[in-house]
Swiss-Prot record:
This is DNA-directed RNA polymerase subunit beta. InterPro entries: DNA-dir_RNA_pol_bsu_ext_1_sf, DNA-dir_RNA_pol_su2, DNA-dir_RNAP_su2_dom, DNA-dir_RNAP_su2_hyb_sf, RNA_pol_bsu_bac, RNA_pol_bsu_CS, RNA_pol_Rpb2_2, RNA_pol_Rpb2_2_sf. It catalyses: RNA(n) + a ribonucleoside 5'-triphosphate = RNA(n+1) + diphosphate. It comes from the Eukaryota. GO terms for biological process: DNA-templated transcription. The keyword Repeat does not apply. Keywords: Chloroplast, DNA-directed RNA polymerase, Nucleotidyltransferase, Plastid, Transcription, Transferase. It is found in: Plastid, Chloroplast. It comes from Dioscorea elephantipes. Its EC number is 2.7.7.6. DNA-dependent RNA polymerase catalyzes the transcription of DNA into RNA using the four ribonucleoside triphosphates as substrates. Its main location: plastid. It holds the Pfam family RNA_pol_Rpb2_7. In plastids the minimal PEP RNA polymerase catalytic core is composed of four subunits: alpha, beta, beta', and beta''. When a (nuclear-encoded) sigma factor is associated with the core the holoenzyme is formed, which can initiate transcription.
């Protein structure tokens, strides 16, 4: 956080700063730490030694640019070179070379990595801190059982528990318990050392009986007992050195490694002075933990809160990348060792370059970015989504929790989250509370703790000094809440303010305050900080709003909000969607593709994004904002992004809204809109879909891209050029060919179709031996071709030489079934589009744009939308924009209401429209029915809120099946929109037909027109010949499937037919 010129004022840190700092820590520290761990490698005869000289490693600047990496589906990475030496011990000769050991993926200016042309981001994981924790639980008899849990660096657990008889047991990873004396003896301590290093030796002496004394009589017996309990599969083990080494490797090295953080926490908790370099669990640690457990049993000491943030740590991108780098070095070590041994065996002379290959780094990082749960594809629906994704916190992932097993207590808000983790912004569904978001001012400390800034209030100095505190420190201070007055207002000494102390909220005098919050937004994430009047909303609705803002699609013409919070500019700036001037200069040339300006004699060109596709199929582009010849300053906005206006975030539109019922069309969260929103492209958005096809080299030969496709209509090939690829600017319909491709196949007589064999036999025509495998446009993909890319990867394999990508743009107006939402959790589906003359209109004749249900406000308690609605109307009339920080009631009571009413009154006076503010019902107005011209009985709340169009579009979801594919085994229709699946007549349609009594239509729907195979064929024959359609004699496939499923449950089912002649019952198998 940067100090400003004004006293006590600071700028908000960059929203991508946590990602940048983590990656820089990996490059500056993590690489060197892991390289120093690389051992010297010797052959079996110890004649040759291989080592790395890591002090002078080099990272080379990438050979390609970010745009080229995305365009060509490559990884944006840097090559790592390290000097290596090969030493012959007999002659003491050394051969030194600088070797290339692998590529390190780099982070770009968005805080993301480009892997195979795809933007990916590594999110932060929150884990339990390694160390010692004490807790108490009630057993089945209602008696408290005290437990000490020692958590290792990788998450393994060793539990010590004391029972009613004051006996101490050890339990490894929740398995069967053993005596703590057996554990300590297996770790190398004898009984005398144990008794000399504990505070309560009498408890340890009263514990063992004769059998136990025999087990702890020697280290060998203790190791056998321990091995038999936790590692032995079966039988009676016999002590040996290999058994001892196996136990040492499986348990004492892997499960008992505390790490640097665990050693520090254990020393602090147990008052030990063990050196930080000793990161493994020692017998002294176990003895101290047992001593403290006995004191807990006697009522001395305090229990630990496992959910407190002081007992958590952040596993950032630096830790994850460092772990993968260490794993790659281990694989490299194994490969080098094997290569050296092979060279010596075959009497070859190796050199450092021949010993090292880069495959270990390539495979490690590709598998990490592609398969690791914490490496995710960057969500680029809009700039807010992009920034919020990088600040996400997850309890899930390796070493963490799962959505099925996490308890409610872990998911709940904790007092230590104050100012660190947003209490609002979390996912909905099974992962609620497990996926969180960082507050906007936090930083990650050296030990992985989440630190939050506070103003330190000093009696000696009137200046405010800002300090960052970890969760373990701020609970010892009296912290004034952020809704106290600002610094420059001056606070009376006798004033009483709300404060926080030791996880409790108090009301105390100002002179007792030690710290105070620095900003009203300090507790919230970016998404929650963009909600105006959030303090008037229920937290559940604020949660929905912060999630739905990330689902807003970029519109064709953006508009910034009238009522905002002030964070819109920084959000847009840090997202990187706008083009910013890096230095001052003068604009020489500008168009839609680039901006050229001169600065100090140098000419610089800034390329602009032009209709690029995001991974959510939304459209990203930049619009120049500076004319030719204009002088610009450093940091000035040169081009706006798809969802920015003047450098501010603009996700939606300010539209005129009335809260009133209208003929039931807006019941249950439905929304009624005017046709103006369609015809004037208010909510029109562009979608870009990507279609790709690859050419392979098959065993019969290479696949060919061509326009000459046999057995296809010319109509489907009309948009292809002479190379067989669709032309730019073409309008494509469903089923059209985008890329023509032929795949060679074996030319056997049996593989020909009957008509092909006939042509060969009669006319002697040689039938093609290639199979048509063209790229066709799928259902719902109609649009305009805006880009075609024919890509051949650099150094690519001959087995995958080429890839062709076609990008198709769709223009989507708002329509019935689309989802819209405000910024207060007020969401709805478009139910009807009315002509503008039928919409309710104001007293000046302006028809409203949307009609919301007023019942959506009281029960959901999101009153903030009412304040925004009325203030937006005043701002529209006064041509003003408002940026309001939350919790403005800290200045005076009813501050929000007073602001809104005063602005409405000013708008009423300035526009000379008394209906804008009527004292009898302020904020409401009499409006008229557009159909009749009569006024409505009650005054209606009208205003201009900011409404977003969400990515849940009806064009992506609506689906109906006419004919399609069937499953081969069951002969039932496939499921899913992508497979053209579904039922033509479902359960409810059958009920409707039954209600009308149409028996013959119902029979047709369930037999001929469905899955009755034989009857379908007979219908085809009867239609061609012209006869009557025979009645089906047996059951359709759906009934046969039911019978088979019943038989699988051991239920035999047969059906019987009654003969028409003699009514004899003839049994017939189903």
């Amino acid at each position: 956080m940067i100090r400003d010129g004004n006293e006590g004022m600071y700028t908000i840190p960059g929203f991508n700063q946590i990602q940048f700092e983590g990656f820089c820590r990996f490059i500056n520290q993590g690489l060197m730490e892991e390289l120093h761990k690389f051992p010297k490698i010797e052959d079996t005869d110890q004649e040759i030694e291989f080592q790395l000289f890591v002090e002078t490693y080099q990272l080379v600047e990438p050979l390609i640019k970010e745009r080229d990496a995305v365009y060509e589906s490559l990884t944006y990475s840097s090559e790592l070179y390290v000097p290596a030496g090969l030493i012959w011990k007999t002659s003491r000769a050394m051969q030194e070379q600088t070797i290339f050991i692998g590529n390190i993926p780099l982070m770009n200016s968005l805080g993301t990595s480009i892997i195979n042309g795809i933007y990916r981001i590594v999110i932060n994981q929150i884990l339990q801190n390694p160390g010692v924790y004490y807790r108490s639980e009630l057993d089945h008899n209602g008696i408290s059982v005290y437990t000490s849990t020692i958590i290792s660096d990788w998450g393994g657990r060793l539990e010590l528990e004391i029972d009613r008889k004051a006996r101490i047991w050890a339990r490894v990873s929740r398995k069967q318990k053993i005596s703590i004396l057996v554990l300590l003896s297996a770790m190398g301590s004898n009984l005398r050392e144990i008794l000399d290093n504990v505070c309560y030796p009498e408890i340890f002496l009263s514990f063992p009986n004769d059998k136990e004394k025999k087990k702890i009589g020697s280290k060998e017996n203790a190791i056998l007992e321990f091995y038999q309990q936790f590692a032995c599969v079966g039988g009676d083990p016999v002590f040996s050195e290999s058994l001892c080494k196996e136990l040492q490797k499986k348990f004492f090295q892997q499960r008992c490694e505390l790490g640097r953080i665990g050693r520090r926490n254990t020393n602090q908790r147990l008052n030990l002075d063990i050196p930080q370099k000793n990161t493994f669990l020692l017998p002294r640690d176990v003895l101290a933990a047992a001593d403290h457990l006995i004191r807990m049993k006697f009522g001395m000491g305090t229990l630990d809160d496992m959910n407190h943030l002081k007992n958590k740590r952040i596993r950032s991108v630096a830790d994850l990348l460092q772990d993968q780098f260490g794993l790659a070095l281990v694989r490299l070590e194994n490969g080098v060792r094997g290569t050296i041994c092979g060279a010596i065996r075959h009497k070859l002379i190796p050199n450092p370059k021949n010993l090292v290959t880069s495959t270990s780094f390539t495979t490690t990082y590709e598998s990490f970015f592609g398969l690791h749960p914490l490496s995710q594809v960057l969500d680029r629906t809009n700039p807010l989504t992009q920034i919020a994704h990088g600040r996400r916190l997850s309890y899930l992932g390796p070493g963490g929790l799962t959505g099925r097993t996490a308890s409610f207590r872990i998911r709940d808000i904790h007092p230590s989250h104050y100012g660190r983790i947003c209490p609002i912004d979390t996912s909905e569904g099974i992962n609620v509370g497990l996926i969180g978001s960082l507050a906007i001012h936090v930083r990650i400390g050296h030990w992985g703790s989440i630190e939050s800034p506070f103003y330190e209030i000093s009696e000696r100095s009137k200046k405010a000094q800002m300090i960052y505190l970890s969760p373990s420190r701020d609970e010892y201070y009296m912290v004034a809440a952020g809704n106290s007055l600002a610094l420059n207002r001056g606070i009376q000494e006798e004033q009483v303010v709300p404060a926080r102390y030791r996880q409790e909220f108090l009301t105390i005098a100002w002179e007792q305050i030690h710290l105070r919050s620095i900003f009203p937004f300090q507790y919230f994430s970016i998404g929650a900080s963009l909600i105006p009047f959030i303090e008037h909303n229920d937290a559940n609705r604020a949660l929905m709003s912060s999630n739905m803002q990330r689902q807003a699609v970029p519109l064709s013409r953006s508009e910034k909000c009238i009522v905002g919070t002030g964070l819109e500019r920084q959000t847009a700036l840090d997202s990187g969607v706008s083009a910013i001037a890096e230095r001052e200069g003068k604009i020489i040339y500008t168009d839609t593709h680039k901006i050229i300006f001169s600065s100090n004699g140098d000419t610089m060109s800034i390329p602009l994004v032009m209709y690029q596709r995001s991974n959510k199929n939304t459209c990203m582009h930049q619009k120049p904002q500076v004319p030719r010849g204009k002088c610009i300053k450093k940091g000035q906005i040169l081009a706006d992004g798809a969802t920015t206006v003047g450098g501010e975030l603009a996700l939606g539109k300010n539209v005129l809204v009335a809260h009133m019922p209208w003929e039931g069309y807006n019941s249950e969260d439905a929304v009624l809109i005017s046709e103006r929103l369609v015809y004037e492209d208010i909510y029109t958005s562009f979608y870009i879909r990507k279609y790709e096809i690859q050419t392979h080299v098959t065993s019969q030969g290479p696949e060919r891209i061509t326009k000459e496709i046999p057995h296809l209509e010319d109509h489907l090939l009309r948009n292809l050029d002479r190379n067989g690829i669709v032309m730019l600017g073409s309008w494509i319909e469903t089923g059209d060919i985008l890329v023509g491709k032929l795949t060679p196949q074996t030319a056997t007589e049996s593989s020909y179709a009957p008509e092909d064999r006939l042509l060969r036999a009669i006319l002697g025509i040689q039938v093609s031996t290639a199979k048509e495998t063209s790229l066709k446009l799928s259902i719902g993909g109609r649009g305009r071709v805006i880009d075609v890319r024919w890509i051949q990867k650099r150094g690519g394999s001959i087995y995958n030489p080429e890839m062709i990508r076609v990008y198709i743009s769709q223009k989507r107006e708002i329509k019935v079934g689309d989802k819209v939402a405000g910024r207060h959790g007020n969401k709805g589906i478009i139910s009807k589009i009315l002509p503008r003359q039928d919409m309710p209109y104001l007293q000046d004749g302006t028809p409203v744009d949307m009609v919301f249900n007023p019942l959506g406000v009281p029960s959901r308690m999101n009153v903030g939308q009412i304040f925004e609605c009325s203030l937006g109307l005043a701002g529209d009339l006064l041509k003003r924009h408002y940026r309001i920080a939350p919790f403005d009631e800290r200045y005076e009571q009813e501050a929000s209401r007073k602001l809104v009413f005063s602005e409405l009154y000013s708008a009423s006076k300035q526009t000379k429209n008394p209906w804008v503010f009527e004292p009898e019902y302020p904020g409401k107005s009499r409006i008229f029915d557009g159909r009749t011209g009569d006024p409505f009985e009650q005054p209606v709340l009208i205003g201009k809120p900011y409404i977003l169009k969400l990515i849940h579009q009806v064009d992506d979801k609506i689906h109906g099946r006419s004919s399609g594919h069937y499953a081969l085994v069951t002969q039932q229709p496939l499921r899913g929109r992508a497979k053209q699946g579904g039922q033509r007549v479902g359960e409810m349609e059958v009920w409707a037909l039954e209600g009308f009594g149409v028996a013959h239509i119902l029979q047709e729907m369930l037999t001929y027109k469905s899955d009755h195979i034989r009857a379908r064929q007979e219908v085809l024959g009867a239609t061609i010949v012209g006869g009557t359609v025979p009645n089906p004699e047996d059951a359709p496939e759906s009934f046969r499937l039911l019978v088979r499923e019943l038989r699988s449950l051991a239920l035999e089912l047969n059906h019987f037919l009654v003969s028409e002649k003699n009514f004899q019952i003839n049994r017939k198998e189903a």
